[in-house]
């Protein structure tokens, strides 16, 4: 009987992942591309339903991923070196889970082989987001959906 081979996200640390493995940890939920607000009193971070202007509201994919930082200078670029800062990411995020030494959920495309499972399981905000192009920044507080952490 052949030995079981552990998936790369179990047997490697974040620093050991190659670019393709790193990028594949993204489940495509789009939550990191939602606008967030920080409470000035306790520094809590709150997610809103307001999506980056480049995010496709249905597929939860960036419409210009390769060049996103040119049009959105404050776009978040996750790297393995930031793992200790991943607490603001949703608890379902592949990057956060692997950084915490946890396995990926059953609906993650690397586990189930289906990139649309994140939408079928309603982990993503597909169909529930609004583009930042259509909501005044002063109104973002009206669209809070959850607290990070």
From Swiss-Prot:
<protein>
    <recommendedName>
        <fullName>UPF0260 protein PSPTO_3918</fullName>
    </recommendedName>
</protein>
<dbReference type="InterPro" id="IPR005358">
    <property type="entry name" value="Puta_zinc/iron-chelating_dom"/>
</dbReference>
<comment type="similarity">
    <text>Belongs to the UPF0260 family.</text>
</comment>
<dbReference type="Pfam" id="PF03692">
    <property type="entry name" value="CxxCxxCC"/>
</dbReference>
<dbReference type="InterPro" id="IPR008228">
    <property type="entry name" value="UCP006173"/>
</dbReference>
